[in-house]
Amino acid sequence: EQAPKAVSKVFVGVSAGMVLGVPVTSFIASEVSFSMAMLFFTVANALVFVATILFIPSMPVKEKVSYGAQLSVLKKTTMWYSIIAVTLINGAMFGFFSYMSDYLKKVTEVPYNVISAVLLVYGLANIVGNVMAGKLLSINAKRSIILMPFALLVSYICLFIVGEWIGAMVIVILILGVLAGIASNNMQYMIAEAAPEAPDFANGMFLTSANLGTTIGTAVC
């Protein structure tokens, strides 16, 4: 019953990495070169790979699950509903994120240093959302999952209404950051619950669906 809270801690790490990684790599690319920024990525990923080998314990396997048994979860209607939901929600979130800087620059008309600060606020709010998600899913997962798309929809509409006012925009983006953190946990929970008999395959489908949504969302937006 504590699984949602444990997963939320993992997403906190992911969000923290984005909060720190985006400004650091942007700085390296602008002040040194794009090649050095890519080298930074390489070194960071290599360190994570080594740390995973050294510090992450092997997960005990209760019973071996065949490839056929894992693929059979794709016959479940709930799995496909979850895959579609993850693709659409992640597409919406990253579609918005892909043009947020441009929107702040052209519509809200704020300088780039302020945009960087707003992006930092969004990232930090994302971490808060991750922490909240674990508690919300533990209390009432169904309610959290059902309400989230509507909360995102209302927030996106508010962006267009208050787009010219920086103060209001910061508040809405702060709320969106929290909602995005909650939504990320909700999406993983949906797919994991749809296929509890094949957790590794379910996690793979979550990442595939999320990446597909990111690709479609950023391309369309």
What are the functions of these language-model segments?
Residues 143-187:
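C-terminal transmembrane helical hairpin of 12-TM major facilitator-type secondary transporters
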Residues 1, 182-195:
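Intracellular juxtamembrane helix-capping segments at the cytosolic ends
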Residues 17-29, 101, 133, 216-221:
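Small-residue (Gly/Pro/Ala) motifs that create kinks and tight helix-helix packing interfaces
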Residues 9-56:
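Helix-loop-helix hairpin linking two adjacent transmembrane segments in secondary transporters
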Residues 194-221:
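A late C-terminal transmembrane helix in Major Facilitator Superfamily
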Residues 56-83:
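Juxtamembrane intracellular "pre-TM" segments in multi-pass secondary transporters
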Residues 80-119:
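Extracytoplasmic gate region of multi-pass secondary transporters
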Residues 129-141:
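Helix-to-loop junctions at the C-terminal end of transmembrane segments
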